[in-house]
């Protein structure tokens, strides 16, 4: 049985199946199975650690290889195809991935460990054929252009080739530095007004220049604003990721945040996803923060960071600023229910 595991709970389910059915061989790949190095007979995960006191079942193999690598054929060499299960209503929305590559070219954010992906299993699509346009489904098709963070090269090559149809929406993650903004502008100009439904996700994290530098983002608040002005000019939808849980905020960061939010163009951001910092194993923040360990069975996925009362107050003030400007700048704040538990 071959399983593609996106989240650790999928991996845990495969682990439980392997224990329950020892006569069946289970092979698990997918995003959560990614490896730091490729060692024969050993799994070297990036996103989780396995309890040292637990031995995984012998009939469970976890691998960072792609399906093509596993079966020994060139990546992206086959015909891309997606069969929709018959019990899914024909007019419903479906969401699927179209992989461009499997790493982040930036590699410097302190809370992320995508940079650790083993080079031996790097894969990159050479031809953007957009085969997903032929999926046999009448409803809305939401296509994730899957990368760690889309490269300037793919911005210029992939975006102008996307079919523009009312039944196709696209999602992608982009850095908001000057190089990426220029590449995005080049692609949008090349489309000459024939722009499909694009939703761009980007990591705003904490928009003060001091905190952006600390987090390893590699851009400034000025570059962020340039990116947002461009997206608004072309009518793109923006999902901004805003991160809290920092243990080093100062009053100047709050003033810088308010200055940024005041300067942000109205109606530029559609949604703001508020997240509390998660320290993954092997990420740099894992060694500089503390928190209660998160386990799913024998799989350790890090911890939600704990901060002292003074830092909780500063993080709470930052959240209040974002909420206040959501009404002024007309964007929806998401994630409030889950994040409040960490501020008590």
Regions found by a protein language model. Name each.
Residues 30-36, 244-247, 278:
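Short beta-alpha junction loops
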Residues 39-59, 190-202, 256-279:
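Structural recognition of alpha->loop->beta junctions
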Residues 2-129:
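Acidic, low-complexity intrinsically disordered segments
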Residues 16, 217-223, 255-257:
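Charged helix-capping and loop-helix junction motifs
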Residues 2, 23-27, 125, 129-239, ...:
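Conserved SAM/AdoMet-binding glycine-rich loop
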Residues 179-180, 247-257:
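Active-site glycine- and acidic-residue-rich loops that bind
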Residues 252-344:
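C-terminal accessory regions of radical SAM enzymes
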Residues 39-41, 109-110, 158, 184, ...:
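Short aromatic-enriched loop/helix-cap "lid" or pocket-rim segments at secondary-structure transitions
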């Amino acid at each position: 049985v071959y399983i593609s595991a996106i989240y650790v709970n999928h991996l845990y389910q495969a682990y439980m199946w392997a224990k329950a059915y020892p006569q069946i061989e289970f092979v698990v790949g997918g995003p959560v199975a990614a490896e730091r190095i490729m060692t024969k007979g050993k799994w070297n995960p990036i996103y989780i650690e396995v309890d040292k006191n637990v031995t995984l079942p012998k009939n469970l193999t976890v691998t960072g290889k792609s399906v093509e690598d596993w079966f020994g054929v060139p990546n992206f060499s086959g015909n891309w195809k997606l069969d929709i299960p018959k019990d899914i209503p024909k007019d419903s929305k479906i969401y699927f991935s179209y992989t461009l590559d499997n790493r982040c070219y930036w590699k410097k954010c302190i809370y992320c460990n995508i940079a650790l992906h083993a080079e031996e299993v790097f894969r990159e699509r050479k031809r953007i054929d957009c085969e997903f346009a032929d999926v046999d489904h009448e409803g809305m098709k939401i296509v994730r252009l899957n990368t760690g963070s889309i490269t300037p090269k793919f911005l210029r090559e992939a975006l102008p080739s996307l079919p523009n149809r009312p039944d196709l929406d696209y999602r992608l993650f982009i850095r908001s530095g000057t190089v990426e903004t220029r590449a995005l502008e080049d692609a949008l100009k090349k489309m000459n007004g024939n722009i499909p439904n694009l939703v761009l996700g980007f990591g705003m994290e904490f928009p003060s220049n001091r905190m952006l530098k600390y987090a390893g983002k590699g851009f400034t608040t000025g570059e962020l604003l340039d990116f947002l002005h461009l997206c608004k000019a072309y009518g793109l939808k923006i999902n901004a990721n805003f991160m809290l849980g920092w243990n080093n905020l100062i009053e100047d960061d709050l003033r810088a945040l308010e200055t940024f939010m005041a300067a942000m163009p109205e109606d530029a951001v559609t949604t703001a996803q508020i997240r509390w910092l998660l320290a993954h194993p092997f990420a740099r923040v894992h060694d500089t923060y503390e928190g209660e360990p998160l386990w799913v069975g024998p799989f350790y996925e890090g911890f939600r960071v704990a901060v002292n009362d003074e830092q909780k107050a500063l993080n709470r003030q930052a959240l209040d600023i974002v909420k206040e400007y959501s009404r002024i700048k007309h964007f929806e704040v998401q994630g409030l229910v889950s994040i409040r538990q960490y501020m008590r």
